[in-house]
Amino acid sequence: MSDIFPESHPEHPLNLIPELCRKFYDLGWATGTGGGISIKMGENYYIAPSGVQKERIMPNEIFVLNASQDVVEEPRTEKQLKISECTPLFFNAYRLRGAGACLHTHSANCVLISLLCDREFRISHIEMIKGIINNETKKALGFRDTLVVPIIENTDFEKDLTASMAECMVRYPESCAVLVRRHGMYVWSDTWQKAKGAVECIDYLMGLAIRMRTLGLEWEPKGAK
């Protein structure tokens, strides 16, 4: 069960989502109004608005939803904000994985990897793999384990990814992430801390894999110890 914080607490989703959006923007993961973040606390689901400058989101601009995906609290602002286009995809993670947070990035590394791979991104024998949790066993992957991130095809509208993402999550029960070709990536976990750690590790591994490819190095080295 997630901790319940007062609105004044820095880890309350109303404060945490804007902070994480700024960090994602600085990393190039949420530029041009792209990307999104959702965090669950108690019975409520907090979601950043759509089509706004992610580095400038304020606590009073967050939507609050219930488990039925109904908005129970509108942003406390006069701005005419629209709920994130990612909302039904975030709820895939909540409903199918019991996640506590789901993060969506438009990282260039994710897009490039989706172009280099067919149906999956696979990599092993890299230390940062240890920072990713097997979604089924809830245990961290080991150095010799293979990280597998499945890839789905992009659509014209974000909401139209909902069904294919859900089907992919069923086919890959161990994965905590789904790549969307030519688009970005969704990552989830039990807590926002674990989801943040996972997306950082996966993006690092993807960036490394791109460089390895230019050097002729294998992502899954045969006979490696």
Swiss-Prot record:
Its cofactor is Zn(2+). It comes from the Eukaryota. Binds 1 zinc ion per subunit. The active site is at 127 (proton donor/acceptor). Zn(2+) binds at residues 104, 106, 183. Pathway: Amino-acid biosynthesis; L-methionine biosynthesis via salvage pathway; L-methionine from S-methyl-5-thio-alpha-D-ribose 1-phosphate: step 2/6. InterPro entries: Aldolase_II/adducin_N, Aldolase_II/adducin_N_sf, MethylthioRu-1-P_deHdtase_MtnB, Salvage_MtnB_euk. Substrate binds at residue 86. One of its GO terms (biological process) is L-methionine salvage from methylthioadenosine. Belongs to the aldolase class II family. MtnB subfamily. HAMAP family: Salvage_MtnB_euk. This is Probable methylthioribulose-1-phosphate dehydratase.
